[in-house]
Structures are given as C-alpha cells and as structure tokens.
C-alpha cells in the first residue's frame, strides 16, 4: 500500500479541525465531540477519519463540501475557502460564530427586558429615569452620522477603506501586527478621557477581513471612551448596547453606504454578488451579507 505523508493536504487537516470546533460550538460544550463524530459527517470509518485529521486525505470535492455544509448548516462558500487555503482556522471559526448582533431583537431583547425590570438600579443612574426603550436604543442614525463624519474627515471616496489611513486621524489609536499572538487581537490602554491611548495588536502580518472588523470595533470603543467629537452626539448606554453599536459601527465603516450604493451598480448580476462586493471592500462574505441586509432595510 502506498504510504501517504502526514499533513500532505494541510488545508484538509484545517477543515477537519474546523468541523470539530463547529460541532463543539453547536453542542455548546454539553456533548464531548470526538474525532469520529467529524468522520461520521461523511460516513468515514476510523481509518479514513484519521487520514482526514492528519491531512492524508484531500477533502475538496464540491459534493463532499456540500454534505458538510448541510450537516453543519453553514454557507458552503466558507468550506470551499477553507479547503482552498484562503481562510485559516481562526478566521473560519469567527465566521461560523458570526459577527454578533447588529440590533436588539428577539431573545436578546426579551432577556434584557427581564433583567431591566428585575434590577433597574443596575442600569439607571441616580438622577436618570429612562424607559427601557430609551436606555437600550441602538440609535443607528447617530452611528451613521459618526461614520459619515470620519469618512468625510479622511476624504475616503473609493472602496476599500484602509484602516491604517483612518488611524492617521486618531494618533492615540495604533494598530500593530504581532506574529506571536495566540488570540486574534490584543488591546492595551493607557490613560483616560482625551488622553486615552489604545494599541490594538492583531495576529499575523496580514490583516484578514475578520481582523479588520475587530479593529474597527475597538476604534469605536476608543472614540466613545476618549469622548471624541465624532461620537459626542451619541448618548451613553449600557455595555450590552455598546457592544451592538460597535458591531454596527464596524460594518458601516468598512462598508460605507455611499460606497456600497456605487459598487452595487458595478457588479455583474450573473455572478455571486456577495462574493464580488466582499472582495471590493475587503470584508468577509458573512459580514457583506449582514451589511447588505442592513442596507436594504435602511437604504444607507
């Protein structure tokens, strides 16, 4: 029998590792996921499963990836990118988990309402008596206004938006690449208020789309915590709302409404629109999907 070198197909090994992590996320840690659970997705016996895990088996046939996509309820385009080596493990897991909430709806809203009425003093200041709707208002128009002011200040007119150029507008906000990081980003702060300095280190020398999103989120938090004039019109809010606002800000900054409208007119409708736009704006397909839904609902 011909002996196949271990890790001959490293992207297949990454795909295996991702599938195992995705199953673990699905079961929320309540079920111990073993290697054979991953192999079972494709009906593999223990030997084939082991070969896949060790990168001895090349998994990239479209029909096979579709089977995995159906089992994990995931966009097959992400699996195709993993199998082709375009997306690494950390980025794939981030994509699978999603980019977080961009609005306060459904179960999240209901849970916050219960907590608010059970313990209102946790959210209300001494002289503040705001309603739930006022206190937990995402205030999208104000976030849009902040993004528009930054885009105008930097005179950005063409996609993609370069984060290093945006950082030039804010000398106290610094981005640094760091190959030694084990997490996607690491944030360090110094000082407070107008003197606040923030350094965001990101993993690797190449700022991948998901890292751009995470850095943009940190920029919003910096603007809020340093009382920047760009966000002076935005009312303070609970941490739960700040997190959603940061997601919304990042999406709007990386894919500004005016630029998106312009680029949508250029795309080839006979091909995958999401893929085309994600490549233009240097964002992931998942974020572009979210941003397009947001754009269609709000027209900006």
Predicted features along the sequence, with ranges:
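A short, Lys/Arg-rich alpha-helix, primarily the initiator
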Residues: 1-37
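Short coil turns linking two alpha-helices in DNA-binding domains
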Residues: 34, 45-48, 61, 75, ...
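Recognition helix of helix-turn-helix/homeodomain-like DNA-binding domains
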Residues: 43-60, 81-85
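Key DNA-contacting residues within the recognition helix of helix-turn-helix
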Residues: 50-51, 66, 80, 289
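DNA major-groove recognition helix of helix-turn-helix/homeodomain DNA-binding modules
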Residues: 61-78
């Amino acid at each position: 029998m011909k002996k196949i070198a271990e890790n001959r197909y490293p992207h297949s090994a990454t795909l295996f590792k991702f599938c195992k992590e995705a199953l673990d996320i699905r079961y929320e840690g309540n079920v111990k996921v073993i290697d054979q659970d991953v192999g079972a997705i494709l009906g593999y016996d223990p030997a084939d499963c082991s070969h896949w895990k060790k990168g001895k088996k090349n998994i990239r046939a479209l029909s096979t990836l579709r089977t995995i996509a159906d089992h994990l309820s995931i966009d097959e385009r992400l699996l195709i990118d993993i199998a082709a080596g375009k997306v690494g493990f950390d980025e794939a897991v981030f994509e699978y988990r999603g980019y977080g909430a961009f609005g306060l709806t459904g179960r999240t809203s209901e849970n916050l309402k219960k907590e608010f009425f059970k313990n209102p003093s946790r959210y209300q200041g001494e002289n503040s008596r705001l309603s739930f709707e006022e206190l937990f208002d995402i205030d999208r128009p104000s976030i849009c206004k902040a993004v528009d002011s930054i885009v105008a200040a930097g005179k950005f007119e063409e996609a993609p938006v370069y984060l290093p150029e945006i950082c030039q507008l804010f000398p106290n906000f610094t981005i640094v690449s760091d190959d030694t990081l084990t997490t996607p980003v690491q944030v360090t702060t110094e000082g407070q208020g107008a003197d606040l300095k923030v350094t965001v280190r990101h993993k690797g020398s190449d700022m991948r789309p998901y890292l751009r999103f995470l850095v943009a989120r940190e920029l919003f938090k910096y603007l809020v915590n340093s009382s920047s004039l760009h966000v002076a019109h935005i009312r303070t809010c609970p941490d739960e709302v700040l997190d959603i606002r940061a997601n919304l800000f990042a999406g709007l900054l990386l894919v500004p409404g005016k630029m998106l409208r312009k680029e949508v007119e250029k795309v080839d409708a006979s091909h995958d629109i999401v893929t085309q736009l994600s490549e233009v704006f240097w964002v992931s397909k998942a974020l572009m999907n979210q941003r397009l839904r947001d754009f269609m609902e709000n027209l900006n």
